[in-house]
Swiss-Prot record:
<dbReference type="GO" id="GO:0006633">
    <property type="term" value="P:fatty acid biosynthetic process"/>
</dbReference>
<feature type="zinc finger region" description="C4-type">
    <location>
        <begin position="33"/>
        <end position="55"/>
    </location>
</feature>
<keyword id="KW-0963">Cytoplasm</keyword>
<protein>
    <recommendedName>
        <fullName>Acetyl-coenzyme A carboxylase carboxyl transferase subunit beta</fullName>
        <ecNumber>2.1.3.15</ecNumber>
    </recommendedName>
</protein>
<dbReference type="GO" id="GO:0005524">
    <property type="term" value="F:ATP binding"/>
</dbReference>
<feature type="domain" description="CoA carboxyltransferase N-terminal">
    <location>
        <begin position="29"/>
        <end position="285"/>
    </location>
</feature>
<dbReference type="GO" id="GO:0009317">
    <property type="term" value="C:acetyl-CoA carboxylase complex"/>
</dbReference>
<keyword id="KW-0444">Lipid biosynthesis</keyword>
<keyword id="KW-0808">Transferase</keyword>
<keyword id="KW-0067">ATP-binding</keyword>
<dbReference type="GO" id="GO:0008270">
    <property type="term" value="F:zinc ion binding"/>
</dbReference>
<keyword id="KW-0862">Zinc</keyword>
<keyword id="KW-0479">Metal-binding</keyword>
<dbReference type="InterPro" id="IPR029045">
    <property type="entry name" value="ClpP/crotonase-like_dom_sf"/>
</dbReference>
<keyword id="KW-0863">Zinc-finger</keyword>
<keyword id="KW-0547">Nucleotide-binding</keyword>
<dbReference type="InterPro" id="IPR011762">
    <property type="entry name" value="COA_CT_N"/>
</dbReference>
Length: 285
């Protein structure tokens, strides 16, 4: 008993004082580059189109920021904003995951679509947002793409689609896979009408999206070092029993092997698209 008393008396007595510096920077003020880890002011980064000042890494843009960057002020008209996913297979927890992503992103689904003008030229646009279910393609994403393509076909508008996706949405099973064929049919009608489709592939674009509408543009563009592919690198290596090149499935690798027309730095994105639309308009007229 006395031994325990003396042992207790030897214990250090102290108070934990919280570091006041921990809360000096409000949330959202700073952003860390996922590539070089440099910390930058979010406002300045946004003004630079989310391109890192230090390593030139192209950090993901939200769907609305992307549209804002390539459209005249106030010209964007959104289509089908209220369309949301059901749970056709009664997949456990799917509704909760959708609701969580809706709250986190402010989006109803992984794609925003509509019409806009760029330097006065009207066009249809669809932009995938990888923050929502990793940009996976389900029934709503496929339906929204088809609706905007069909609108462009009817009104004879060029169409631009920005891909950013992990592939088909597993929670919707075969219904998600059906969107690959469904979107391709709409694009075929658009093409048969003699209209322009620009596929702009961003990081990452994989799975069923890379194997369908992302790869069949009249002009296929991409951003530097974007990951583009169908199956994962490890799966391919195990299947063919060979080591793949270090730059395999990058935009630069695909450009070198003829699968892309050009890799565009984000600062040149608006000007490049404007020039293409102007040329198409002149030829069409």
């Amino acid at each position: 008993m006395f031994k325990d008393f003396f042992n207790r008396s030897k214990k250090k007595k102290y108070l934990t004082v919280q570091d006041s510096k921990q809360n000096d920077v409000p949330a959202g003020i700073m952003t860390k580059c996922p590539n070089c880890k440099k910390i930058m002011y979010t406002k300045e980064l946004n003004e630079n189109l989310n391109v890192c000042f230090n390593c030139d890494h192209h950090i993901a843009l939200t769907a609305y920021k992307r549209i804002e960057a390539i459209s005249d002020d106030g010209s964007f008209i959104e289509f089908d904003r209220g369309m949301t996913s059901a749970n056709p297979l009664d997949f456990p927890g799917y509704e909760e995951k959708i609701e969580k992503d809706q709250q986190k992103t402010g989006l109803n689904e992984a794609l925003v679509s509509g019409t806009a003008k760029l330097d006065g030229i009207q066009y249809g646009v669809a932009v995938m947002d990888a923050r929502f279910r990793m940009g996976s393609m389900g029934s709503v994403v496929g339906e929204k793409i088809c609706r905007i393509i069909d609108y462009c076909t009817e009104h004879r508008l060029p169409f631009i689609l920005f891909s950013a996706s992990g592939g088909a949405r597993m929670q919707e099973g075969i219904i998600s896979l059906m969107q690959m064929g469904k979107t391709s049919v709409s694009l075929k009608r658009h093409s048969d009408a003699g209209l322009l489709y620009i596929s702009y592939i961003t990081n990452p674009t994989t799975g069923g999206v890379s194997a369908s509408f992302a790869s069949v543009g009249d002009i296929n563009l991409s951003e530097p070092k974007a990951l583009i592919g169908f199956a994962g690198r490890r799966v391919i290596e195990q299947t063919i029993n060979e080591k793949l090149p270090d730059d395999f499935q990058t935009a630069e690798f695909l450009l070198e092997h003829g699968q892309l027309d050009k890799v565009i730095h984000r600062k040149d994105m608006r000007e490049t698209l404007s020039n293409i639309l102007k040329i198409h308009q002149e030829v069409s007229n």
